[in-house]
Each structure stands twice: as structure tokens, then as C-alpha cells.
């Protein structure tokens, strides 16, 4: 696997399954953000991936789901869980302090961190 070729591309089914695993099994209020997240992560222009690494793809996924809530509750937890699960599914395990992950999600929600910074942080937490 190279960082440019995910073994498992993102799809809406993956995101829906991730939502089912959250405490309280929150229902989807709006499917639009799920499809937007998938389209963004898989986006290509001029025959090149917009997000050239798994870490940038996971960062774009996290940002999209945090900034465009789609569940009846637990949207921040959902966004983090999806980003981490996407990395793990593609062979990239993370090791991070939970409080720092919470702070990262808050910074994404506030607009203080963009995709590039989030991608670098995810890469820094990678242990595989």
C-alpha cells in the first residue's frame, strides 16, 4: 500500500456502519454531509487525488463531518471515529492522548485547524 492508494476507499456504507457503533445508535438526520464527505475524500482533479495521502483524506473526512453535522447527536465523536477507523482500515493505526484528540476536534470545529495541520497531526500520531 502506498500513501496514495487506499486499500479500502471510503463509501457511505462505511460511515453508516460507524454511526451504528456509537453509543445510543444516533440516527441520521441529514444524508447530505455523508455523501459530501465521501465525495470530498475521493475527489480527483486533473487525474490526481485532491488529498494525496491517507492522513489528508482522514483530515478532510474529519473536517467535513465536524463542520456538517449529520446525526441526531454525537457528531464530533462520529467524525473522530470515522477518521480514525478509515485510517485503521487502510493500515494506519494511531496512538494519541485522548484529551489531545478532543482538542483537535474542537480546533477543527472552530476553524482553528485546517486539513493540512490536521493531516500532519494524524501522521504524528501514526504508529504503523
Predicted regions and their residues:
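FIC/Doc superfamily catalytic core
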Residues: 1-128
Amino acid at each position: 500500500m502506498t500513501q496514495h492508494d487506499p486499500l479500502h476507499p471510503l463509501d457511505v456504507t462505511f460511515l453508516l456502519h460507524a454511526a451504528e457503533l456509537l453509543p445510543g445508535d444516533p440516527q441520521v438526520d441529514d444524508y447530505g454531509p455523508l455523501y459530501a464527505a465521501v465525495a470530498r475524500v475521493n475527489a480527483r482533479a486533473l487525474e490526481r487525488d485532491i488529498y494525496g495521502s491517507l492522513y489528508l483524506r482522514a483530515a478532510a473526512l474529519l473536517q467535513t463531518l465536524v463542520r456538517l453535522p449529520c446525526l441526531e447527536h454525537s457528531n464530533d465523536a462520529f467524525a473522530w471515529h470515522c477518521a480514525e477507523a478509515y485510517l485503521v482500515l487502510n493500515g494506519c493505526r494511531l496512538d494519541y492522548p485522548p484529551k489531545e484528540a478532543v482538542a483537535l476536534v474542537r480546533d477543527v470545529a472552530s476553524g482553528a485547524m485546517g486539513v493540512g495541520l490536521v493531516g500532519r497531526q494524524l501522521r504524528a500520531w501514526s504508529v504503523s
